[in-house]
Every structure is written in structure tokens, then in C-alpha cells.
């Protein structure tokens, strides 16, 4: 089968032929019909892969700590060899898709061969193996193309759950990419009043047309003033940050937009300084 992979060392993409995967007792084999490109996540993964070793270390201090621990227990030479081996590997891309079940592990219930499912954690491949708990049946009225958004949509929904908001709450969404647009729509569908902010005028227009009561191009103090007027001087009940930037501006701006004791949730990939 064909699968899209990326070099860990340099970020180069390749479409490769790989063996058909085998499933375990808790897994499901699915023939992919649609897979979703999560632009923010996949762009960040590719940017990290293309970075120098020093830049990789700064971006992933957790991995640096793993390397240090391994060097202490196994020695320097085995650690260097392990790091080089990891850098020479290729990793699959993608995590949100839909397709038709081909085979079901013996411990899986709720789906059977022939069912259409939305899947999470699967890459861009002709056939995918996913945990049975990450394969959700798709209603007949929902297309495969729409079902492929399920995992990304669940990320947006989880951000709103962490925000702990209800009908009538005022929610500001900072960053109107794919996850931000879904967050705004889900908040609106939950009965919230929604304001969206982004640096991209096109993204702001999309939100204004589909999901927000107020959509703003980020303009510093003017944006803060507009949010205060929209919230009648109170500030937002929750600020959900779905931006993708190395800058800490979104996290620094959020308190200016929020009321006293509001909730600020970071869903995106932003600086935290």
C-alpha cells in the first residue's frame, strides 16, 4: 500500500510503498477514503524536521532530557548511535481520516467489516490501523469527506470543554485556522456569543461569514477596545487560543480580552513566555 512519510532529519516528504499492516486484538483495519491535512500541525512537524539539531533541541527539551538520561545509563556511544538511527527514520503524517472497516480485532466491539468510520491517529495511507476506540461509526447522512474532520473537531471540542462555558457565555477565539474555525462554530452551536481574532484578513472573513458575532483582524489596543465594547465592558468569559506561532503574543494578549476569573485555554502551538 502507499503511505505519505516525512524524513525526521530534513523534513523531505515521500510517497512510499509499505507492507499492509496487521492488526492486534484491540485494533481495526480501515481502507482510507479521505484523510484530512491539518495544516497547522503538519506545518509545525515539517518545520521542526527541517530545523538544525540545535533548533530541534530548543524546540523539544523533553527529547533532550531523554537523550541525557540514556547517555547516563547506556553511555555516550550507544546514545549517539540511537540518535542517528532516529534521525534517519521516516515518520507517517496525518491523524484525522475516514474510511471503511476491513477487519476488526477480537476485542473490538461497536464496529464490523463494511462499516464506515471516522478514525483518529491514522496517517495519510491507503490502509490504516487504528485503536478500536478511535474508530467511530459514521451516520449515513454524513459523507466521508465531512467525517474526516472528526478528530480535528474533537480537538476543538475538548478546548471548549476545558473552557467550561455554557449557553450565553462570551468566548473569544484567537487564531482562526482550521481548529479555530471549528472552535468558533462549535461554540456558536453551543449557544455562546463568539468573537474571533486573527492576523489574516481572509480567515477573519471566513469566521465572520460562518460562525462569529464579531470577527477582528488583530490590531493591538484597537482589538482590545472592540472586545471590551462587544462584552459591555466585562471581557470574555473564556479565551481559547488556537493560533500557531512561535510568538508569545497570543498568551500575553489573552488576559486583556478576558473578564476577572475567566478561563484561558491554549489549544494551539504558541509561545508560552
Positions of predicted regions on the chain:
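Short N-terminal strand-loop motif that marks the start
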Residues: 1-85, 89
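Residue-level marker of beta-strand positions
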Residues: 34, 115-117, 127, 170, ...
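A glycine-/small-residue-rich N-terminal strand-loop-strand element
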Residues: 78-87, 96-121
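A structural motif shared across PLP-dependent enzymes of the aminotransferase-like
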Residues: 92, 120-133
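Short, well-ordered loop/turn sites that connect or cap secondary structure elements
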Residues: 111-112, 165, 258
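Mid-domain Rossmann-like dinucleotide-binding core that forms the NAD(H)/NADP(H) cofactor-binding site
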Residues: 116, 146-220
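Glycine-rich cofactor phosphate-binding loops and adjacent beta1-alpha1 units
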Residues: 205, 210-273
Amino acid at each position: 500500500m502507499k503511505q505519505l512519510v516525512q524524513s525526521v532529519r530534513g523534513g523531505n516528504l515521500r510517497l512510499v510503498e509499505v507492507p499492509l499492516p496487521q492488526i492486534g486484538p484491540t485494533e481495526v483495519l480501515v481502507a482510507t477514503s479521505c484523510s484530512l491535512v491539518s495544516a497547522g500541525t503538519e506545518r509545525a512537524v515539517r518545520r521542526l524536521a527541517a530545523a538544525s539539531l540545535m533548533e530541534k533541541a530548543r524546540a523539544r527539551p523533553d527529547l533532550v532530557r531523554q537523550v541525557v538520561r540514556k547517555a547516563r545509563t547506556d553511555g555516550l556511544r550507544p546514545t549517539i548511535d540511537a540518535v542517528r538511527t532516529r534521525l534517519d527514520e521516516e515518520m507517517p503524517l496525518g491523524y484525522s481520516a475516514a474510511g471503511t472497516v476491513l477487519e476488526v480485532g477480537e476485542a473490538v466491539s461497536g464496529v464490523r467489516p463494511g462499516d464506515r468510520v471516522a478514525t483518529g491517529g491514522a496517517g495519510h495511507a491507503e490502509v490504516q490501523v487504528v485503536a478500536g476506540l478511535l474508530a467511530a461509526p459514521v451516520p449515513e447522512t454524513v459523507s466521508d469527506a465531512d467525517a474526516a474532520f472528526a478528530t480535528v473537531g474533537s480537538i476543538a471540542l475538548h478546548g471548549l470543554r476545558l473552557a467550561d462555558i455554557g449557553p450565553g457565555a462570551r468566548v473569544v477565539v484567537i487564531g482562526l485556522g482550521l481548529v479555530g474555525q471549528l472552535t468558533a462554530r462549535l461554540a456558536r452551536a453551543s449557544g455562546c456569543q463568539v468573537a474571533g481574532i486573527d492576523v489574516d484578513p481572509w480567515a477573519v472573513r471566513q469566521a465572520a461569514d460562518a460562525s462569529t458575532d464579531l470577527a477582528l483582524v488583530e490590531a493591538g489596543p484597537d482589538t482590545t477596545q472592540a472586545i471590551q465594547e462587544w462584552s459591555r465592558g466585562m471581557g470574555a468569559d473564556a479565551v481559547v487560543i488556537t493560533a500557531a506561532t512561535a510568538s508569545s503574543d497570543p498568551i500575553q494578549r489573552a488576559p486583556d480580552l478576558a473578564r476577572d476569573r475567566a478561563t484561558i485555554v491554549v489549544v494551539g502551538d504558541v509561545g508560552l513566555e
